[in-house]
């Protein structure tokens, strides 16, 4: 089975290449899928979230039964090494997974705002554009927010996501972190901007799928 998954990953690699042209070059050679382990780091925290239709649910609804890639963003972020970078990586991975049928139905993305005062469900829908629903069986990409900073707090604290607010309270900043979560809801990898690259993330997804068979 490991050989089959590795072969599938190698077949997917050329398809991935044309999606990463605008991303910084990979500074290291990622090990092949299945040649390493990703140990449990922590259980993903629980909290209340809202989808783009304003429907409330527990975050755990979006973190089980599939491999989940979760990133915190805010829609007004202009730091090229922050939210825009994460968005480009997620977008490249989405296209690569669409080209890899063996990954269909096994992966989801979650983009969660940490600016609930501005990032309403309606605004998150506009931010998502056409990415909310994948009709080709590739994956589902959820864009979520919260009702208030109070409901957001246990999530950012639980994930260890650093957020800073300017003295005037008008500007936000954060250190980019993206979380790879297994089908049981455990964080298995945390990516910073230096290590967030579609090929390394794709290899980690393949490794988790091999590990959880």
Task: For each feature predicted by the language model, list its residue ranges.
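N-terminal targeting signals for export/organelle localization
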Residues: 1-46, 50, 212-213
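Generic structural signal for well-ordered beta-strand positions
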Residues: 57-58, 188
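Extracytoplasmic
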Residues: 42-44, 62-69, 104-109, 119, ...
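Sec/Tat-exported extracytoplasmic proteins
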Residues: 42, 66, 73-76, 81, ...
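Thiol-/selenol-based redox modules, centered on thioredoxin-like
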Residues: 151-213
């Amino acid at each position: 089975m490991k050989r089959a998954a590795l072969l599938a990953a190698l077949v997917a690699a050329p398809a991935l290449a044309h999606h990463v042209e605008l991303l910084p070059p990979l500074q290291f050679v990622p090990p092949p899928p299945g040649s390493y382990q990703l140990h449990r780091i922590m259980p993903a925290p629980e909290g209340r979230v809202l989808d783009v239709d304003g429907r409330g649910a527990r975050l755990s609804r979006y973190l089980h039964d599939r491999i989940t890639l979760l990133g915190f963003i805010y829609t007004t972020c202009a730091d090229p090494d922050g939210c825009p970078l994460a968005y480009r990586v997620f977008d490249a991975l989405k296209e690569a997974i669409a080209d890899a049928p063996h990954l269909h139905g096994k992966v989801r993305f979650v983009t969660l705002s940490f600016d609930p005062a501005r990032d309403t469900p309606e605004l998150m829908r506009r931010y998502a554009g056409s990415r909310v629903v994948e009709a080709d069986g590739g994956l589902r990409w959820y864009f979520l927010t919260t009702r208030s900073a109070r409901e957001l707090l246990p999530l950012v604290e639980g994930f260890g996501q650093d957020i800073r607010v300017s003295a005037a309270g008008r500007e936000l900043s954060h250190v980019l972190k993206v979380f790879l979560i297994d089908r049981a809801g455990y964080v298995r990898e945390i990516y910073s901007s230096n290590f967030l690259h579609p090929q390394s993330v794709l290899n980690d997804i393949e490794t988790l799928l091999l590990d959880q068979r």
